[in-house]
Amino acid sequence: YPTDPYLSAEQIRRKIFLKSLIHVGIILVDSRLMPARIGTSGVAISCAGVEPVLDMRSKKDLDGNPLKVTFQAVVDNLATIANHKMGEGAESKPFAIVRNSGAKLTDRKINSSEMAIAPEQCVYVRGLANPPKN
């Protein structure tokens, strides 16, 4: 990983803008494993120029009920798409272009804390810390 992946993403975004005058979102991507799932999927290690998370709380679900805890991990979802297109083996490509994703572009600086939660809020960490009693 870069020493400061958020700075690296911002530098790439600025270079693209200065060269082409196009506003883009940049997501630096790696692959990850998911508990109880076969295979890898993409994960955003940083981003710039794109809102990383969409707060869906108080929006309606399919039945018209308000959502209470839903945050959509926009850049992680896009990272999975990009990871699939970039590949994992000898065929891998250094970048992917994802268009018309509906992600919200922004000029504000993205902070690493926006894409993470405290360990005590994480269902995986809590589950490991509190194993079921037999």
Regions found by a protein language model. Give the residues of each.
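A structural signal for small-residue-enriched, beta-sheet-centric alpha/beta enzyme cores
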Residues: 24-134
